Structures are given as structure tokens and as C-alpha cells.
Amino acid sequence: KADYYVDLHCGDGFEGLVSYVYCTGAAAPEVAAKSREMAEIAHVDYLVTSMYGTGGAYNYAGSMGIPSILLERGHSSRWCEDLVAEDVHDVKNILRHLGVLRGKSHMHGKPPVEVSPVIYEDAPVSGCWYPAKQPGETFKEGEVLGRICDYFGRELFVYRAKMGGIILYQTISLCIMKD
């Protein structure tokens, strides 16, 4: 039995990302509220409330009544001492906030900015991915976010922003497969 769940991620090998946190939203109101509290203690700039009850251990935990978050920090399945130290600091701070560890928790300036709605795009074709934006960069509705080309440079598909927002994570490998 778990009272709380904190999942630590660093992006898959093909993903670039800016540090952010997911909290579970598809849960009982008190579980979702405690998950959000945990997320707001994290020292990241952005927060996403996931409205899925499945698709990840933290979502499943939330659906089972366990307040949970997923911290994304790092990229490309890489790590460094500074990022590990930030995760350790966040986990200890969250545990202090929850009363699991002694001591006083603290906020890091302002709470993370809620990113909502979130659009997850899949590749409609396989090819070579040429992003126009990097994780952490903002964009306006209609802006080109990236292109998929064939091996000879012929454009197969152009991604345009459906609304203004920020790139939290994206594929950073040249090869992209149709989803």
C-alpha cells in the first residue's frame, strides 16, 4: 500500500524536453487536489493536469486513490549530477510538505504555470523530422512547429500550431515513424 506516488522521468532517448510536472486529475477530488499540491511544490516552470486514469503508473495510482505526480527533468534518456540533485531536492521537499519527513517545505518562487489544454501530436507519415521550435520555446496559432520530409528533402507534412502555447517535449531524432 502506498500513501503517495512520485514518478521520476528524464525523457525517452528520442525526446527533448523542458522540466515540468504532471499531476493526476482523473481521480477523486481530494486525490486530485493533493496531487496538485505535490506538483506545485516541485521546482519546475510548468504543470500539466492529466485527465487520464490509465496510461502511466502515476495515472493509475491516482485512479486507485493515491495522490501522484510525474516529474519530467532532463532529456534523451540522459542524466547529470545537477538534474539528479534537483530531483532529490524536489522529492525531499514534497515529502516534507506531506509530513513524511521532518522540516518545513518551501515554494520556489512562484508555482508552476498550468499548461492547458495540451495537444499531443502523432506523426501521420514516416520520414525525417525537422523541428522549427525547441522544448521551452513558445509559439502562436498557425506557426510552423516542424516538418516531416523524405530522404531527398521533399516535404511530406507540415505541423502548424492549432493554438498558442509552449513546446514541453518533442521528438529530437531525425527519424520519425508514423504513429
Where are these regions (language model features)?
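Structured catalytic-domain cores with a bias toward divalent-metal coordination
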Residues: 1-179
